[in-house]
Every structure is written in structure tokens, then in C-alpha cells.
Amino acid sequence: MNAVIVIPARLSSSRLKEKMLADLEGEPLIVRTWQQATKSRLASRVVVATDSERIFAVLREAGAEVVMTSPDLTCGTDRIAEAAEQVGGDVFVNLQGDEPLIDPATIDLAIAPFFGEGPLPDCTTLVFPLKPDERQIIDDPHVVKAVLDTRGNALYFSRSPIPYRRETLPDTKYYRHIGLYAFRADVLKAFVALPPSMLERAESLEQLRLLENGYRIRCIETTTDTPGVNTEEELEEVRRLFRERFGA
């Protein structure tokens, strides 16, 4: 079994201009994310997929493996799939390029089920437990929530607070979805060939395309939260946390 981490890295970004090249203690943000990914124990290879010659150049200088992908791709999963065709592999991990604080052990949580006994998962992802009284987070449409079945497979993902709390129950479980995925190679190829689904378009959540088409997404619980970078304020916070963690 050969697991490959692919990090999609577009130069254009809507909220924070060219964030992949933002400085993080002397290195571009995307280089810091790649450095963390290379510490994974289960992945045999880490590849960055980009549409930018500038990103390509800084990563090659850092020693990373980089592939160029089409600038016309509309989402990170399409970029992962195009890179997968170039590099080959059995399992492909989609790791966001703006997560320089990702714990390598967290990445391995998503990969591990593909190395276990029994049938291989279609896809795995991560969820972070929330407390029922964390209403501000649960009600936030920018925070994607997940509900799971008793085997840990996703029943649904939504920007709405799910499950809806009609009455207070002490055992109600809430999960925040963490957007790291590991795909079986054939599932990734099938996924990007499918048209956007109704629920996907309604929620603006591409993972719903898998669920609507009968694929299972196994959710692994993690207690390690990983901040991303979408605003200048979040970048400053990640810089502070990076200095604390790595002593830069």
C-alpha cells in the first residue's frame, strides 16, 4: 500500500492575497506545510500540486517534489486528481496548503485505516468533538458539522447545526469537520468524474457528492485542532503559535 500526500497550492486566494507565499518565520507558508507533511510516518511521498510558477520555484528551492497542474481547475480535489495521474499511488491524502501547524500524527490518523485488516475504506476524513454548549461554533455556517453512524461513517455534513437540538440531551454528540481527506485511488478518480450533486451545490460542500453517490466516508475523531489561514488575523495567530511550538 502506497500513500501519497498531495498538497494543492493555488496562488490566487479570495480573502488573503497570495497566502501560500506569505512569510512564516523566514519561509513561505506552503513550505512550512510541506515540511510538516514530510514528517508523516505512513505516507511514502509528499507532492505539492500548484498552478503557479512562483510557488513551484520556492518549493523546488526548498527541496520539495512539485507538479504543475491546470490553472482552470475549480477545486482542490480536482487538483489532487490531476496530480495523482502524474505521480501514481494507491491512496491519496488531500492536505490543505494553509495548515503549517498540522501534526504529522493527525495526518496518519486518516491514512491508518487503509493499512488495517478488512475492506479498504472509500475515503477517510477527520472530525473534532464539540461540546453541546459551544453554540457559537455549532451555529456558525463557516464551521462544517458532521453526524456519524455507529460505525463512524458520515451520515451527513452541513453548515447548519446538526443534529438539531429539539431538547437538551446529555449524550448528544457534535463534531466539527476537519477538511483533510484520504481517498482510495479509484474512488478519487470516480469522484472527480461525477457531476456536482444537488446537496453539494446547496451546502457548497463537495464531500456530499460522495455520499449522494453511495460512497462511504469514514470519520476518525481527533482531539488535535489545526488552524488554517484565511485572513491576516489568522496569519498573525499562526505566526504566534508557530513561534511557541517551534521556538522560531
Curated annotation (Swiss-Prot):
Q: In which pathway does it act?
A: Nucleotide-sugar biosynthesis; CMP-3-deoxy-D-manno-octulosonate biosynthesis; CMP-3-deoxy-D-manno-octulosonate from 3-deoxy-D-manno-octulosonate and CTP: step 1/1; Bacterial outer membrane biogenesis; lipopolysaccharide biosynthesis
* Keywords in alphabetical order: Cytoplasm, Lipopolysaccharide biosynthesis, Nucleotidyltransferase, Transferase
Enzyme Commission (EC) number: 2.7.7.38
Any single Pfam family the record assigns to this protein: CTP_transf_3
- InterPro entries in the record: Cytidylyl_trans, KdsB, Nucleotide-diphossugar_trans
| Organism domain of life | Bacteria
Q: Which terms does the record give in the GO molecular function aspect?
A: 3-deoxy-manno-octulosonate cytidylyltransferase activity
Q: What's an example GO cellular component term for this entry?
A: cytosol
**Annotated localization:** Cytoplasm
Q: Which reaction does it catalyse?
A: 3-deoxy-alpha-D-manno-oct-2-ulosonate + CTP = CMP-3-deoxy-beta-D-manno-octulosonate + diphosphate
Q: Which BP terms does GO give this entry?
A: CMP-keto-3-deoxy-D-manno-octulosonic acid biosynthetic process; lipopolysaccharide biosynthetic process
Q: What does this protein do?
A: Activates KDO (a required 8-carbon sugar) for incorporation into bacterial lipopolysaccharide in Gram-negative bacteria.
Which PANTHER family does this chain map to? 3-DEOXY-MANNO-OCTULOSONATE CYTIDYLYLTRANSFERASE, 3-DEOXY-MANNO-OCTULOSONATE CYTIDYLYLTRANSFERASE, MITOCHONDRIAL
Regarding protein family, the annotation reads: Belongs to the KdsB family.
- Protein name as catalogued: 3-deoxy-manno-octulosonate cytidylyltransferase
Name the source organism.
Chlorobaculum tepidum (strain ATCC 49652 / DSM 12025 / NBRC 103806 / TLS)
Question: Gene symbol?
Answer: kdsB
